Amino acid sequence: MLLLLAEYLQQFHKGFAVFQYLSLRGILGVLTALSLALWLGPWMIRTLQIRQIGQAVRNDGPQSHLSKSGTPTMGGALILSAIAVSTLLWADLSNRYVWVVLIVTLAFGAIGWVDDYRKVIEKNSRGLPSRWKYFWQSVFGLAAAVFLYKTAPTSVETTLILPFIKDVTIPLGVGFVVLTYFVIVGSSNAVNLTDGLDGLAIMPTVMVGGALGIFCYLSGNVKFAEYLLIPYVPGSGELIVFCGALIGAGLGFLWFNTYPAQVFMGDVGALALGAALGTIAVIVRQEIVLFIMGGIFVVETLSVVIQVASFKLTGKRVFRMAPIHHHFELKGWPEPRVIVRFWIITVILVLIGLATLKLR
């Protein structure tokens, strides 16, 4: 939006041409979203408290979590609002990738909003039935996958890239739709499962989102892409503005979500942010790198799958409780220790993911 204004004002002063630089608009995206989140955060928390929109805590979880009952939830709406406003202000709105990621993010946020709303109204932690949640996730995930497949100008945008391996790619064809569906929906649910402790999900999301922003910037520049042997995806560089907005909004939210949390993001935030990461990774052809950098999300998801499968097959549980962050809590780890150690692991995994740019 402001990019169009800057383009118009260039005829009066050439200095406005500076807004053509992606790096500047990415930074402005961070600062705008961060400012909005910090400014609106206290108001949103008060509003949630007045409306008694509080978190319902399961009785079968860690006993230390019972004190969290009633903490304002649905704070993810703050994150999404800051991301949307910042992106609309600083991104090139003629870029199709910007709209794909923004629409997918808001669509999954809407699913999470309904889920959270039902939890608040019914005063339980179950929310929207799983079958309906997965149904609507599948609808939006498949819609995004089909759109990206149908509008891909070259086969490069539907080819699987293997990190660490030079000149080896796998043409997916229609299989691209299937892979994209699983990446978007899987990432959405993985972040949601991770969002069980104060600040546990948002900081890894910010770190992975920032790293994906680097991939977007490099993939959208033909010279960088050729030098680093990564796919050149014209227009993908514009997503650095969205990634910047995600970083700013996430850090602003963390200000209120850090232990002990004043507000939880709820499914409205977790489902949306996970879907956003998955969609961006698909666009820049870095699905496997997302799997590496988001290792915490992957482990959290696998712990649930293993726990359920083990109990159904043998009647025994592998972990004291799943997702795995609760397992460590029940082993006696204080909540802040679990959170920070998971953050440290994410830093390491993100660095490994970024290393794939050169190690080929």
UniProtKB/Swiss-Prot annotation:
PROSITE patterns, per the entry: MRAY_1 (PS01347), MRAY_2 (PS01348)
Keyword set for this entry? Cell cycle, Cell division, Cell inner membrane, Cell membrane, Cell shape, Cell wall biogenesis/degradation, Magnesium, Membrane, Metal-binding, Peptidoglycan synthesis, Transferase, Transmembrane, Transmembrane helix
State which residue ranges cross the membrane.
Answer: 25-45, 73-93, 97-117, 134-154, 168-188, 199-219, 236-256, 263-283, 288-308, 338-358
* Entries under InterPro entries matching the protein: Glycosyl_transferase_4 (IPR000715), PNAcMuramoyl-5peptid_Trfase (IPR003524), PNAcMuramoyl-5peptid_Trfase_CS (IPR018480)
Question: What is the required cofactor set for this protein?
Answer: Mg(2+)
List localization entries: Cell inner membrane
Q: Which GO terms are recorded in the biological process aspect for this UniProt protein?
A: cell division; cell wall organization; peptidoglycan biosynthetic process; regulation of cell shape
Presence of the UniProt keyword Cell membrane in the record: yes
For the keyword Transferase, the answer is: yes
Q: Which reaction does it catalyse?
A: UDP-N-acetyl-alpha-D-muramoyl-L-alanyl-gamma-D-glutamyl-meso-2,6-diaminopimeloyl-D-alanyl-D-alanine + di-trans,octa-cis-undecaprenyl phosphate = di-trans,octa-cis-undecaprenyl diphospho-N-acetyl-alpha-D-muramoyl-L-alanyl-D-glutamyl-meso-2,6-diaminopimeloyl-D-alanyl-D-alanine + UMP
What is this protein for, i.e. what is its function? Catalyzes the initial step of the lipid cycle reactions in the biosynthesis of the cell wall peptidoglycan: transfers peptidoglycan precursor phospho-MurNAc-pentapeptide from UDP-MurNAc-pentapeptide onto the lipid carrier undecaprenyl phosphate, yielding undecaprenyl-pyrophosphoryl-MurNAc-pentapeptide, known as lipid I.
Q: What protein name is recorded for this chain?
A: Phospho-N-acetylmuramoyl-pentapeptide-transferase
Q: Which organism is it from?
A: Pseudomonas putida (strain ATCC 47054 / DSM 6125 / CFBP 8728 / NCIMB 11950 / KT2440)
